[in-house]
Regions:
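Short acidic/polar inter-strand loop motif in beta-rich domains
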Residues: 2-9
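Short edge-strand/loop segments of extracellular domains
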Residues: 13-34, 82-84
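Hydrophobic helix-coil surface modules that form long, contiguous segments used
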Residues: 32-43, 49-182
Length: 182
């Protein structure tokens, strides 16, 4: 899979190069799909074209993605190796976010994202890597986002009898709008 520059063709998946030379990746619809049979239209075998959608069955995903160690990442499902990929401070903030039902908790602040971006540009291509592992059950698709430049916040939300995490990841250019409305 060749990751496209989504600023050229406006695809919903791809990378964007920021003014400082760093990239942000938002990756979806990147793996082969099985055709779906519908009793209304028969076999749905159209490939994805731009803004169209697939007819996808529900499935389970267990995905490991290796990225530069200074990147943060989130994806469909649950991060199952959080303690391996989060710093101690990120873990403390995450634990606080799981109890914060009234306001988002910053997992990665703007200052931290900007410092990571500056270090990434100064140090060139990183050699250290981290593997993030996500599991998702009964979902139609899997996607992920990663960058060293992302600000990251989380907040617990009660849906029925379950607590889930509402998550926002965005580059510093998204502020103050995203931080105010996340």
């Amino acid at each position: 899979y060749n990751v496209p520059d989504h600023t050229i063709d406006r695809a919903r998946s791809g990378y964007e190069v920021y003014d400082d030379g760093n990239k942000g990746f938002v990756i979806a619809q990147f793996y082969p799909r099985m055709a779906v049979y519908s009793d209304v239209e028969g076999w749905q075998n159209s490939q994805f074209w731009g803004r169209d959608e697939f007819a996808l069955p529900f499935g389970d995903f267990d995905v490991s993605i290796t990225v530069p160690a200074d990147h943060i990442m989130d994806a469909t499902g649950v991060l199952v190796n959080r303690k391996e990929v989060f710093s101690k401070e990120m873990m403390r903030r995450f634990e606080r976010a799981t109890q914060s039902f009234d306001a988002p908790v910053m997992i990665v602040t703007q200052a931290e994202a900007e410092a990571a971006a500056a270090n990434g540009v100064a140090n060139g291509i990183p050699t250290a890597k981290k593997t993030w592992r996500f599991k998702a059950e009964m979902v139609r698709d899997f996607g992920f986002a990663t960058s060293r430049r992302f600000i990251w916040d989380m907040m617990a939300v009660k849906i029925g009898n379950r607590d889930v995490m509402a998550v926002s990841m965005y580059p510093p250019e998204g502020n103050p709008l995203w931080e105010d409305w996340s």
